[in-house]
Design a protein with these regions (language model features):
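A short alpha-helical cap/connector motif
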Residues: 1-95, 101-179
Length: 179
């Protein structure tokens, strides 16, 4: 039940901010729930990277028809090792879902991911950062995003908590957008 509620909540979030975006860009593929949601929402191109080999292989098998069509682009490894190559596939404003915090591994790639987006020539993507404030200081994340474009505005969307996070944190996703 939690997974279906979580998937519904995520689909509502992506649908709300899809606007005219045709490209969905994700760090942290996990089981491919967001990739499937992006396909269901009819994004023309879905780009995702996963650091865990088992999850990557699961998703590669699951989405092979879309990979063959060039609609889904999956990468295996650390997002920061692939960001520049992945961003070459982005030729228009896109919806970014930054959820690349690996299970059981210290550190988080968010700062480097945002730096790569900052160096990309397009400066008006919609960026959603998962799990604020579980992993980050929201003001620091906002400041980093404003380095990309000082016109970004921010909204905090209520996220459906899973597992033990429900008892510890009120969990939010940070949405940065250009009005």
């Amino acid at each position: 039940m939690i997974k279906s509620n979580h998937a519904l909540k995520r689909k509502e979030l992506f649908s709300k901010y899809k606007q005219n975006h045709n490209i969905f860009f994700e760090t942290g593929t996990h089981h491919g729930f967001s990739v499937q949601i992006a396909l269901d929402l009819e994004f023309d191109k879905v780009i995702s990277v996963e650091i865990e080999q088992d999850y990557f292989l699961e998703c590669f098998d699951k989405f092979i028809p879309y990979i063959s069509q060039g609609k889904v682009h999956l990468f295996y490894g650390d997002s920061n090792a692939w960001m520049d190559r992945m961003l070459k596939l982005v030729e228009e404003p896109s919806l970014f879902w930054l959820d690349g915090h690996p299970d059981g591994i210290s550190g988080d790639p968010l700062w480097e991911e945002l730096e790569s987006i900052k160096n990309h020539p397009i400066k008006n993507h919609t960026i959603i950062v998962d799990d604020i404030p579980v992993y980050f200081n929201s003001k620091e994340v906002e400041d980093k995003i404003l380095e990309i474009n000082p016109n970004y505005q921010f909204i905090y969307e209520d996220a459906l908590n899973e597992g033990n996070l429900v008892d510890v944190y009120k969990n939010y996703d940070l949405v940065a957008y250009i009005p």
